[in-house]
Swiss-Prot record:
<dbReference type="InterPro" id="IPR000037">
    <property type="entry name" value="SsrA-bd_prot"/>
</dbReference>
<dbReference type="InterPro" id="IPR023620">
    <property type="entry name" value="SmpB"/>
</dbReference>
<keyword id="KW-0694">RNA-binding</keyword>
<dbReference type="InterPro" id="IPR020081">
    <property type="entry name" value="SsrA-bd_prot_CS"/>
</dbReference>
<keyword id="KW-0963">Cytoplasm</keyword>
<protein>
    <recommendedName>
        <fullName>SsrA-binding protein</fullName>
    </recommendedName>
</protein>
<comment type="similarity">
    <text>Belongs to the SmpB family.</text>
</comment>
<dbReference type="GO" id="GO:0005829">
    <property type="term" value="C:cytosol"/>
</dbReference>
<dbReference type="GO" id="GO:0070929">
    <property type="term" value="P:trans-translation"/>
</dbReference>
<dbReference type="Pfam" id="PF01668">
    <property type="entry name" value="SmpB"/>
</dbReference>
<comment type="function">
    <text>Required for rescue of stalled ribosomes mediated by trans-translation. Binds to transfer-messenger RNA (tmRNA), required for stable association of tmRNA with ribosomes. tmRNA and SmpB together mimic tRNA shape, replacing the anticodon stem-loop with SmpB. tmRNA is encoded by the ssrA gene; the 2 termini fold to resemble tRNA(Ala) and it encodes a 'tag peptide', a short internal open reading frame. During trans-translation Ala-aminoacylated tmRNA acts like a tRNA, entering the A-site of stalled ribosomes, displacing the stalled mRNA.</text>
</comment>
<dbReference type="GO" id="GO:0003723">
    <property type="term" value="F:RNA binding"/>
</dbReference>
Length: 163
C-alpha cells in the first residue's frame, strides 16, 4: 500500500484518511484475518475522532447475542460538546454483515483468539474501524521477531555501506 502524507501531517492510504492506529497490536499478536466495519457513534464522538483524540491500544471487540461490540477504546470528550458529550469509554456497536459475524463467533470460541482494533480511519466521510482476528504472541515469538528485524537492518546497513 502506498502511503501519502499531506502538509498537515495527515496520513492517507489507498483513499483512506487514517485517524488512529494501534501500534502495539502487530507487536503483541499474530494477525490472522482483518475486517473493515462501521462503528455506531454519537455526534460529538465523530468530531473528537476527526481531531485524532482516540486511543486504541487497550481496545478489544467481543461478540454478544450475534452483535459485535468495541470495548475499552478511549475517545476523548469533544471540547465544545458540553452536555452532549458521552462517556469516553462507553461500549460501541460495530456494524458487520451477518456472515462475517458468524465467522467471528466461530473463530473467537477457539482458545487464544481475540478481536482487536488495528486502525480507525475515514472512508468516504464515514468513520471505519479495521478489526483483526488475532492470536497472542508468546515472549519467545516477540524476541524472534525482534531478532529478524535486527538482522534485516544489519543487512541493509551493510548493503548501503558497500555502495
Amino acid at each position: 500500500m502506498e502511503q501519502i502524507s499531506s502538509k498537515e501531517g495527515e496520513i492517507y492510504m489507498a483513499g483512506k484518511k487514517i485517524l488512529a492506529t494501534n501500534k502495539r497490536a502487530r507487536h503483541e499478536y499474530f494477525i490472522e484475518e482483518t475486517y473493515e466495519c462501521g462503528i455506531e457513534l454519537k455526534g460529538t464522538e465523530v468530531k473528537s475522532i476527526r481531531q485524532g483524540k482516540v486511543n486504541l491500544s487497550d481496545g478489544f471487540a467481543s461478540v454478544d447475542n450475534s452483535e459485535v461490540f468495541l470495548k475499552q477504546v478511549h475517545i476523548s470528550p469533544y471540547e465544545q460538546g458540553n452536555i452532549f458529550n458521552v462517556d469516553s469509554l462507553r461500549v460501541r456497536k460495530l456494524l458487520l454483515h451477518k456472515h462475517e459475524i458468524r465467522k467471528l463467533i466461530g473463530a473467537t470460541t477457539i482458545k487464544g483468539y481475540s478481536l482487536i482494533p488495528l486502525s480507525l480511519y475515514l472512508k468516504n466521510g464515514k468513520v471505519k474501524v479495521e478489526i483483526a482476528l488475532a492470536k497472542g504472541k508468546k515472549l519467545y515469538d516477540k524476541r524472534q521477531d525482534m531478532a529478524k528485524k535486527d538482522a534485516q537492518r544489519r543487512i541493509e546497513r551493510e548493503m548501503t555501506g558497500k555502495y
